[in-house]
From Swiss-Prot:
Name of the protein: NADH-quinone oxidoreductase subunit I
All residue ranges annotated as the 4Fe-4S ferredoxin-type domain in the record: 71-102, 112-141
One GO cellular component, as annotated: plasma membrane
Organism: Helicobacter pylori (strain HPAG1)
Region Disordered: start-end pairs: 187-220
Major subcellular location class: membrane
Amino acid sequence: MAKQEYKQLPKRAEVHSATEQFKDTIKTSLGLDLFKGLGLTIKEFFSPSVTIHYPMEQLPLSPRYRAVHHLQRLLDSGSERCIGCGLCEKICTSNCIRIITHKGEDNRKKIDSYTINLGRCIYCGLCAEVCPELAIVMGNRFENASTQRSQYGSKSEFLTNEQDAKNCSHAEFLGFGAVSPNYNERMQATPLDYVQEPSKEESKEETPTNPESNKGDENV
């Protein structure tokens, strides 16, 4: 291993007299480093601002931003989209979703309780991806501070207002977990049950290569 050579700096001369102390103060205060720092400060002072006055001003968020969950209702009818299948509870990696259901008179699951522990949630979005009815989606509300713990995870905080859904005062959700824009042509039963689009090779095989030969066959 190579031997390291250390360079010893000369010791600073001790200042005793008042004149020497005054000279040392002037040299330290009015040195070149001080003017460099002041020049940088003045330059940044007159440069355009890159910050905003939060919370009076807020930057726009991406529609696929993953923040506090949002439970949706069906438009026009106002009924809850959730069917109580429990897929979101099963796929949750942080075990923060809890659903309690019972079977109703029509042999359909009825939801007794639906809670999300926001203190454990990691906002991965798996619950929104696996939901077959687009009942739970990831919203853009990231300001969820509260003084009471009971307000974290109650269903009423996540669920869409019934009157807003009936009046169609908001558009269909297009953020994280939403279906593709052409879902009307591809959807069969549920939002995640799509018709597979034909590949390029299959479309080429279906397209006739020589239309004139086909016409001759039809005439025969």
